[in-house]
Amino acid sequence: MDVTITKLVHACLLVETGGKRILIDPGTFSWQDERLDPSMVDGVDRVLITHEHADHVSVEFLRTALERSNGAAVETTPALQAILAEHDINAVTDGTPQFAAPHERIPIGPGPQNVGFHIDGVLSHPGDSHSFVETMPILAMPFAAPWGSLTNGADRARLVRPRYVVPIQDWFLSGGGRTFMYRLAKMALDKDGIELVQIEDFESVTLSV
């Protein structure tokens, strides 16, 4: 099966598989990027949101995506479901297979509810977590965050052993920083036969699984 993944900044991915378009974590960093054209998310069938932090959900971006969608359902945590209801956006807490992926501790205290998603048996997105024990063949993996590290991310990927790792959560890095960090990640993952697939912002890659 072919899977096309478009990176729309930071943790936001547009995944196209099985004739469906799934938007994951449409956050503020994406919405504020002047390169984002709303038509990029035309016709999405599902919107999956791992948790409530602004870098993973922008109400403005979400509302725009829904207006341009094929009647897309929004799937998220109970906590964010309640928040979105205050903005007159309906969300559900089931549908797409989920997996346990607790939010890592952040400098200001515990993180919010966080859920991982398995998309159509091909790709897993853990949100803000390195504490999960399962994945599909493609893993969207955070490597740069206030709550984690490149070492933790690489160790977790080597534990769960996907076929491909797509780095996410990297708005915090400069261009040179990404090059350096992902070179190290590739060296670590190559030892276990895991291919690191770096996708630049607003570019797409098609993988076969």
Residue ranges and their predicted role:
Residues 35-95:
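Active-site HxH/HxHxD metal-binding segment of metal-dependent hydrolases
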Residues 85-96, 103, 154, 164-209:
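Binuclear metal-ion centers of metallo-dependent hydrolases, dominated by the metallo-beta-lactamase
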Residues 9-11, 76-83, 126-131:
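Short, polar loop motifs at secondary-structure junctions
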Residues 12-16, 23, 95-156:
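Catalytic core of the metallo-beta-lactamase
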Residues 12-49, 59-64, 105-108, 129-132, ...:
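Pre-active-site segment of Zn-dependent metallo-hydrolases
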Residues 29-32, 53-57, 81-84, 131-134, ...:
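Active-site environment of divalent metal-dependent phosphoester hydrolases
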Residues 23-27, 44-55, 75-78, 124-128, ...:
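Active-site neighborhood of phospho(di)ester-bond hydrolases with catalytic His/Asp-centered motifs
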Residues 20, 68-73, 160-164, 191-194:
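A short helix->loop->beta-strand "cap" motif at the edges of active sites that frequently abuts
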